[in-house]
């Protein structure tokens, strides 16, 4: 197991290094909106470059009245930072939202527990700034793409079950009005049945005895995350062109609907695009339509 695990890690991180090269090329082709301002902030008490977040807002608007969207980037728990989703955050701010996106440490050096700590600390840092600027903290939505979708759902579920402090020793005082799961990577039971290497990834994420890790235990599948748990209105985004999570998301949606039958779904099957297409290619026609639907979802709930 030791040699197999080490071999997996070597290949896994090499794959994501290659993704980084391609992402740099892709991001140079994107056209960013010119009516959005942003500011970068640090969180935590150290100078770790991953302990940063950014706030984006539309120019010349009354920011005290706008909905807030907190975005958690994906990258298989092992890749990326807030810059990866800067174009997506900017395009959503262009739609008259205040958007916050954070960096968090990656599993090459830490585990998922630490990543959740980073995400919570970044949100607490944002809350402090939001209070100073008189943003409307009663109108906050949470989204994440791919692995970020896992973090978004897990955070909302752990928050309702009051497990954040007992497990992580942290506090988070916020109510999310809505949850947007964008091509999410979760339900480890279903994922583990699709590829032999997923248990190796879970070990990297949660430790050698990952099945005993309290975060794994409390976020490992849809039943644990949703059964007898209050979650806000949810929007689930997938695509038949998603060759990463598409087939898994079909089974995940079936599970979700056992607990939340009224979940709203965007399934891009008419013009199928790849994994997290509305984040990666936010200028494309399909992405524009999907991101407009995200906005409509937010506004429909904001008015209630």
Predicted regions and their residues:
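Alpha/beta-hydrolase superfamily serine-hydrolase fold, recognizing
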Residues: 1-304
């Amino acid at each position: 197991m030791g040699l197999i695990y080490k071999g997996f890690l070597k290949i896994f991180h090499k794959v994501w290094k290659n993704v980084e090269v391609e992402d740099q090329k892709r991001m140079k082709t994107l056209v960013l909106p010119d009516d959005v301002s942003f500011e970068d902030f640090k969180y935590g008490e150290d100078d770790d470059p991953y302990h940063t977040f950014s706030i984006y807002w539309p120019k010349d608007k009354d920011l005290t009245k706008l909905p807030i969207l907190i975005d958690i980037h994906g990258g298989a728990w092992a890749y990326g930072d807030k810059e990866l989703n800067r174009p997506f955050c900017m395009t959503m701010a262009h739609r008259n939202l205040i958007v916050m996106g954070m960096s968090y440490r990656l599993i090459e050096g830490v585990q998922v527990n630490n990543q959740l700590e980073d995400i919570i600390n970044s949100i607490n840092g944002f809350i402090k700034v939001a209070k100073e600027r008189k943003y409307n903290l009663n109108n906050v939505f949470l989204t994440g793409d791919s692995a970020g979708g896992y973090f978004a759902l897990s955070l909302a579920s752990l928050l309702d079950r009051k497990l954040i402090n007992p497990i992580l020793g942290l506090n988070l005082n916020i109510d999310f009005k809505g949850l947007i799961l964008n091509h999410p990577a979760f339900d480890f039971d279903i994922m583990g049945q699709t590829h032999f290497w997923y248990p190796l990834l879970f070990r990297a994420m949660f430790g050698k005895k990952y099945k005993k890790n309290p975060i794994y235990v409390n976020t490992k599948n849809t039943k644990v995350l949703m059964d007898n748990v209050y979650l806000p209105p949810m929007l689930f985004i997938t695509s038949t062109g998603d060759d990463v999570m598409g087939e898994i998301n079909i089974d995940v949606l079936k599970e979700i609907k056992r607990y939340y039958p009224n979940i709203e779904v965007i399934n891009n099957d008419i013009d199928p695009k790849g994994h997290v297409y509305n984040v990666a290619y936010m200028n494309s026609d399909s992405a524009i339509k999907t991101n407009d639907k995200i906005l409509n979802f937010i506004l429909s709930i904001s008015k209630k």
